[in-house]
Amino acid sequence: MAKRTFESSLSKLEKITEELESGELSLEGSLKKFDEGIQLAQFCNEQLEGARAKVEILMKKDGKVQAVPFEEE
């Protein structure tokens, strides 16, 4: 099985959203897609949180480059 990536998960989540919005799935099919979508959304959120934790802003202070943790505004 291929390694799951943020991009592939987001793409699959968008496809699931379109399928659910179409109204053409059975109740059982909709529930399965909904469950899969929740799992994909959680994975994407975890990936974003991990990326946010790694983001650093380089700031110049006293002629030296200093790494500063990213702070969301």
UniProtKB/Swiss-Prot annotation:
Bidirectionally degrades single-stranded DNA into large acid-insoluble oligonucleotides, which are then degraded further into small acid-soluble oligonucleotides. GO terms for biological process: DNA catabolic process. GO terms for cellular component: cytosol; exodeoxyribonuclease VII complex. It holds the Pfam family Exonuc_VII_S. InterPro entries: Exonuc_VII_S, Exonuc_VII_ssu_sf. NCBIfam families: PRK00977.1-4 (NF002140), xseB (TIGR01280). It catalyses: Exonucleolytic cleavage in either 5'- to 3'- or 3'- to 5'-direction to yield nucleoside 5'-phosphates. Its EC number is 3.1.11.6. HAMAP family: Exonuc_7_S. Disulfide bonds: none annotated. Belongs to the XseB family. The keyword Cytoplasm applies. The keyword Membrane does not apply. This is Exodeoxyribonuclease 7 small subunit. One of its GO terms (molecular function) is exodeoxyribonuclease VII activity. Keywords: Cytoplasm, Exonuclease, Hydrolase, Nuclease. It comes from Desulfotalea psychrophila (strain LSv54 / DSM 12343). It is found in: Cytoplasm.
